[in-house]
Amino acid sequence: MVESARELVVVMTHGADHELSSVAFTIANGGMTAGLKVSVFLTSAAVDLVRKKGMEHTVVPPLEPLASLVADFLKRGGRLWACTPCVKARGYEQNDLIAGVEIAGSSKIHELIKAGAATLSF
């Protein structure tokens, strides 16, 4: 069983056009710094973030550029999942997405939540 204080699941629905996408990854990275194992599940417009070049120009001062936040998240071992139906609805395939993204259903987060993971939604 997962220790509830050690796992965090962040569910994102906002894309590159909304500041909450940058806020979510800032908080996810902060969770990792605090010692949490963090997973981000992208759904709806958030799936567009991880399309290659999908977040190149998204900067919300004073936060780091979104592309840097996501790269840091992945480099530090964060798990990044893109909702299967949302990816398919947009006509994307795995090779359309940045490296490190896994196309997955919501069962990935349900397993963690059932085991006691904390959740945040943006």
Q: Where is each model-derived feature located?
A:
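Short, glycine-rich nucleotide/cofactor-binding loops
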Residues: 9-22, 54
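Histidine-anchored nucleotide/phosphate-binding helix
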Residues: 21-36, 40
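Anion (oxyanion) recognition and catalysis
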Residues: 32, 74, 113-114
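Short internal beta-strands
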Residues: 38-44, 80-84
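N-terminal beta-loop-helix "entrance" segment that forms/cooperates
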Residues: 46-60
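Short, flexible loop segments at the rims of nucleotide/cofactor-binding pockets, characterized by
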Residues: 56-61, 96-100
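A glycine-rich helix N-cap at a beta->alpha junction
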Residues: 57-84
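C-terminal structural segments of small proteins and small subunits
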Residues: 90-115, 120-121
